[in-house]
């Protein structure tokens, strides 16, 4: 049976995974390293299920390059592939791309009560839904021309506006000078007739473009007031290419719904410590299993999936936050992982170097597989 690969990794398929694992003795999944259908970013798998077998129960995953390799596949290779123990739960099946030692390490970590999910220290929520970004999000030139500066706040609309693990006033000003749309129009919460002239003029312009007739705007009492305008402590990316990112907010900015907003639950742990702690091989490895990839190479997270990520937290440490931020801006993530893994996972949590190397390998294996599927 040919099915979408979402079977592996989405919550709404959880009951299907449980049914398959309970009903069949052995499940074989054949996957492709490259996308196999023209013109769509959809990953598919072949699902082969067997019932009432005497032995060798479980699940195995066989990878082939493309349809050509599938046509010439040696079925002995399939029969000789390792059959792994199948966890009869709602857990995602992405982990079965790993070998047995890697799977067992992840299971060991999940039962380690020292390592808690992100939800213990942060709430994650979606960003602002403006209803019409072209109207509400402005660049510096437009703001100046229409004299709207007093009626704006800072906003981030794309992940590439972030360069490091902190978004500060200097970053904002650079984006502003580049004429990026980093100003959000927020007129006073008043009826149109009582608004300042600059706001009335701009709102009138929006109505000539029929922006107020769009669904999201039309259901508001005052269409020009964007709801949920709170400023987060940090941002996490909804979609990532290389690795999951948590960015401290030091620019008093909010974000659109392409970027999730984070509130920290405690003042006992500094934002800098949380941001540094996020950059470790354990959290990165679990991110590839917790998030979802639909075939285009991008890893996607809903707020609840970020909250589920295991996040070991640094205790007292001497890691230089500014140095790590600089390395991230230089795209030297491996060097950052070396620094944080050494302090957090090895020194503080007493993981062995072999275990940390395995976790790094899991992240690289799964992220490499994901990004390799960007094209046929």
Residue map of PLM features:
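Signature of N6-adenine DNA methyltransferases within the class I
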Residues: 1-131
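Amphipathic alpha-helical segments in well-structured domains
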Residues: 13-17, 255, 376
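Generic structural signal for hydrophobic residues
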Residues: 16, 199, 274, 340-341
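Non-catalytic, mostly N-terminal accessory regions of nucleic-acid modification and defense proteins
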Residues: 31-36, 147, 207-211, 215, ...
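A structural detector for beta-sheet-dominated domains
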Residues: 33, 62-65, 186-188, 265, ...
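A general structural signal for short secondary-structure boundary/capping elements
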Residues: 48-50, 64-66, 75-77, 232, ...
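Non-catalytic DNA-recognition/assembly elements of restriction-modification systems
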Residues: 89-93, 97, 103-136, 198, ...
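Polybasic, glycine- and aromatic-enriched phosphate-binding surface used to engage nucleic acids
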Residues: 102-317, 323-326
